[in-house]
A protein has these predicted regions:
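Short glycine/proline-enriched turns and hinge-like loops at secondary-structure junctions
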Residues: 1, 112-114, 188-191
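Acidic/His- and Gly-rich active-site-bordering loop/insert found
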Residues: 1-41, 62-67
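A residue-level signal for beta-strand positions that form part of recognition/binding surfaces
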Residues: 6, 28, 70, 174, ...
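Catalytic metal-binding/acid-base residues of hydrolase active sites
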Residues: 14, 23, 80, 105, ...
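Short coil/turn motifs at secondary-structure junctions
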Residues: 14-18, 78-80, 126, 202-204
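Fold-level recognition of mixed alpha/beta catalytic cores in primary-metabolism enzymes, strongest
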Residues: 38, 43-152
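Metal-dependent amide/peptide-bond hydrolase catalytic core
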Residues: 118-215
Length: 215
């Protein structure tokens, strides 16, 4: 710590679900080292980044070097679902003049980043027996039309917004549907579908504007 400008080294310890473990060449929880590389869930995103931050602090300590400003190391949870861990640190007053997010970037500086909002869509239908499906309204068929509109909406937003530093201008703020649930029985017209997803927010765009456009 010191009176100069402060710096945060930030990384997360949570990971997304592993999926079917039989599709992995090694157990996602093994941390097995093969040809000098460690394999396992979160080894790249982002235990490696956390390790590099801790090692940087260790080097400073080994050299008995004291920076002019405070250096804060943050190991947080909840990054994969909105950043609640980092937000908790901010609310508690752990802020600084600058921050380095230790995410994997193929050793390239990334001075800008898009944001994201999560959403849930509920699509109503009208249930009836499959033999009389024309008397009902399939929520699944309604959702298929909505999904096509979401894809077109994503393209439209990338045509409107122009962002610096991105090599692929059409991949800045993607929209993804991550889960879909619906229907009760194979012989019943689906009376509802629930879809959950992620809405990309462009750098410099407010959450409010992104939500308004999506709605």
């Amino acid at each position: 710590s010191g009176s100069g400008k402060s710096l945060i080294l930030n990384g997360h310890v949570d990971v997304v679900p592993v999926g079917p473990e039989d599709l992995w060449s090694e157990s996602p929880w093994s941390a097995k080292i093969v040809d000098g590389k460690l394999y396992g869930r979160g080894s790249c995103d982002m235990k490696a980044g956390l390790a590099s931050g801790l090692y940087a602090l260790k080097i400073l300590k080994d050299l008995n070097f004291k920076p002019n400003g405070t250096v804060i190391f943050q190991s947080v949870v909840g990054e994969e679902s909105g950043g609640c861990g980092t937000l908790a640190n901010i609310i508690k007053g752990y802020t600084a003049d600058g921050a380095i997010i230790l995410e994997p970037t193929s050793l390239r500086l990334s001075p800008i980043q898009s944001g994201a909002l999560t959403f849930r869509l509920t699509i109503p239908g009208k249930a009836t027996h499959a033999s009389m499906r024309w008397d009902g309204v399939s929520a699944i068929e309604k959702y298929s039309l909505l999904h096509s509109s979401i894809i077109e909406f994503e393209k439209h937003r990338h045509d409107v917004y122009d962002v610096e530093f991105y090599a692929s201008k059409e991949r800045v703020a993607p929209i993804n549907i991550g889960t879909i649930t619906g229907g009760q029985w194979h012989s019943t017209v689906a009376e509802s579908v629930i879809a959950e997803g992620r809405l990309g927010v462009f750098p410099g765009e407010s959450n409010e504007n992104a939500r308004k456009e999506f709605e």
